[in-house]
Amino acid sequence: VVKQIARAREINKAHTTFIDTILKHSHKGRIHAEINQLRSDVGGTVTGRFSYANPNLQQIPARNKELGPMIRSLFIPEEGHTWGCFDYSQQEPRLVVHYAALDGLYGVQEVIDAYKDGEADFHQIVAEMADIPRSQAKTINLGLFYGMGKNKLQAELGINEDKAKDLFKQYHNRVPFVKTLMDSVMRKASNNGRVRTWLGRRCRFDLWEPNQYGIHKALPHEAALAEHGPGIRRAYTYKALNRLIQGSAADMTKKAMVELHKEGITPHIQVHDE
């Protein structure tokens, strides 16, 4: 009974969240969503990834093996055309390795060597390096890539503070290049107020906060000086690696879409790494 209730809820959510929304925005059998390529007053992401609205086509389920294909099958190609679906394999982890290799960081060569196997799995590689389960390695990897704090990472892992400290220490000792890269990119953001993505696009850190820890509203420089005095620092620099990696992934994906268009293939939608 419990499984049937859960399934009913899942189907109802798919119907109300996806199908009804798609039909609401259908015009002569077509969907013309609002596409935000960069951050603006009406939407978009700070990293430069695409976002969609009215409807949000990125919310179409993909992981549900039954409902995902059913909903996707509602979208049909033009007559005489065929859909193609392409996605990157471990795009963001590979970018982390790329930037760590550019700086010649200690420990990254082991991952580079492992990647010579086309089927290599970054999270499994790191799990073996750190001697921890793959699930924990993946949680820590993604948490660090996305600028997740220690407390949130601990909660995601579902372990107590002492175990978390031991686990993080073991991870950083055996996979040192991730934290080294994270700290390096953070320093660049703090010193320069920006980091540059793969294609040279600037991700700016223009807001400021007081040096002391606590919950503070990030402000423009002059406002932060007036509010807190000279003891201020750039805000959100802990997310610098995330901006670099996601921003570079966005560059790479958009460049690929342009190249596809040049070859006569029309990109219709981009969802995450697909």
Q: What kind of feature is each model-predicted range?
A:
Residues 1-274:
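Conserved catalytic core of nucleotide polymerization and phosphodiester-bond processing enzymes
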